[in-house]
């Protein structure tokens, strides 16, 4: 099979390792434009808690798919894939290198692998049966059902992504074939994946410091303002850094406890991100925290890859 003609670079990794800065640097060095690959940075008015890059930090580099959705509206991986595919085509048609930057693994992998999404809806009865089973038994039980029927699909889908777990179970029932055995379309793009990481203790210290900086920058006020128009149970409000502050704003928790939870959840999320990228994507890893000079090696790696045919 011939390789796809269009090429994209993905910069992945856990929170707080410098993905946004590297995206700008690569774009400057390689005639690129940055496309957001973070599930929550697509929302307007969610800037501090998502660590959204600022116009000053962009240094004139075009950035796309930021602030494209209202936080009252649910977004999906299918919507992201469609929007990102169109934007990649636009950037590539300008003879610029599309550089996707983000930490939402499933969003990025759906694009890299051209995963089939948003297909024919299954019969309501099947969906309702699994939803009732989820409500009765919990998400861990639901995921175990998928793991027993389709271990490969279970490895690709987090237990917390219950909508996707149910979808995989439905497809298995509808077709009589495992979700992971469904015909897969060919990739639309040739992809080079650059991963950033660092020593775990250093990473956790950086995460804790970032949360403190977010609080000082006005995260609490940002969440309070959002709650004036966005329900607390909205998809956007489930983002780490937002959901933890809601109890304080409702007079149900102490602020220090909520901030501690943000740090804890952020550390746990970083661990899950690393696990996903290591297991699910062919990633070239670098530690720019310990070795900032390696960014030039990354430029060289990308240049050599772009020359390959």
Curated annotation (Swiss-Prot):
* Enzyme Commission number(s): 2.5.1.75
Positions of substrate binding: 15-20
Q: Which GO terms describe its molecular function?
A: ATP binding; tRNA dimethylallyltransferase activity
**Which SUPFAM superfamilies is this protein grouped with?**
P-loop containing nucleoside triphosphate hydrolases
Cofactor(s) this protein cannot do without: Mg(2+)
Say if the entry is tagged with keyword Cell membrane: no
Residues where ATP binds: 13-20
- Sorted alphabetically, which keywords does the UniProt record give? ATP-binding, Magnesium, Nucleotide-binding, Transferase, tRNA processing
Q: Which reaction does it catalyse?
A: adenosine(37) in tRNA + dimethylallyl diphosphate = N(6)-dimethylallyladenosine(37) in tRNA + diphosphate
- Write down the Pfam families for this protein, in alphabetical order: IPPT
Task: Show the NCBIfam families listed in the entry.
Answer: miaA (TIGR00174)
Family to which the UniProt record says this protein belongs? Belongs to the IPP transferase family.
Function, in words: Catalyzes the transfer of a dimethylallyl group onto the adenine at position 37 in tRNAs that read codons beginning with uridine, leading to the formation of N6-(dimethylallyl)adenosine (i(6)A).
**Protein name per Swiss-Prot or TrEMBL:** tRNA dimethylallyltransferase
